[in-house]
Regions:
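Negatively charged
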Residues: 1-215
Length: 216
């Protein structure tokens, strides 16, 4: 492995489509994985080891548009305890549906668009979301997702816009229908389109504190 390699990005690069596999992560002390495999539409990961993310704060858009990605590459064992940004990490990963329940998300502040238009439907109800401020578009058009996330700590979230929404009435409807009535929404300012086209959602959210909401 190159001795000075600390960061990798494929965004808008010529070889993105031709990158088809990561077979080993090695001992590289990464400083960022932001945009690392973005638009690598043929990518799978066969590596059995895990990357060294001890110095990484952003995984934003790491696998965005990796439309075939769904190989079981020990993702659940990744140490993301230093990560603050997960925005768009699996956006447009239509095939992706791997376990992430063991992730330490205690320091994450941004989960916007994380699973947007992905095939994800795994248990993440135990995630620590106490520091998250942005959940906008987190599950937008993630039409398979229907898991219990009712115990999430949303006290610091300010943006939930389009969180469970779809773009238009012609899209496949969201099937999400879980009890999130106990969420603390006292900090939320933006809820615009939060349940747009969520035709199956039928839960009581009447006790939500919407005192600070300016956009519904």
């Amino acid at each position: 492995q190159p001795q000075n390699l600390r960061r990798f990005t494929s965004v808008e690069s010529y070889f993105a489509y031709n990158l088809i596999d990561v077979n080993q992560w090695g001992n590289v002390p990464w400083i960022s994985m932001e945009n690392a495999f973005r638009f690598c539409s043929s990518l799978q990961v066969s590596a059995t080891d895990i990357p060294n993310l001890a110095g990484v704060t952003s995984l934003a858009n790491m696998f965005e548009s990796c439309v075939l990605l769904n190989s079981p590459f020990n993702l659940n064992a990744w140490n993301i305890s230093t990560v603050t940004n997960l925005s768009g990490m699996f956006r447009f990963c239509y095939s992706f549906n791997q376990a992430l329940s063991l992730w330490n998300t205690a320091n994450v502040t941004d989960m916007s668009g994380m699973f947007e238009e992905s095939g994800f439907n795994q248990n993440i109800g135990n995630w620590n979301t106490s520091n998250v401020t942005n959940m906008s578009k987190m599950f937008k058009k993630a039409i398979s997702f229907n898991r219990n996330i009712g115990n999430w700590n949303t006290a610091n979230v300010t943006d939930m816009s389009e969180m469970f929404g779809s773009a238009a009435i012609f899209d496949f409807p969201m099937i999400f229908n879980q009890n999130i009535g106990n969420w603390n929404t006292s900090s939320v300012v933006n809820m615009s389109g939060m349940f747009r086209n969520a035709k199956f959602f039928n839960q009581n959210i009447g006790n939500w504190n919407t005192a600070n909401v300016t956009n519904m």
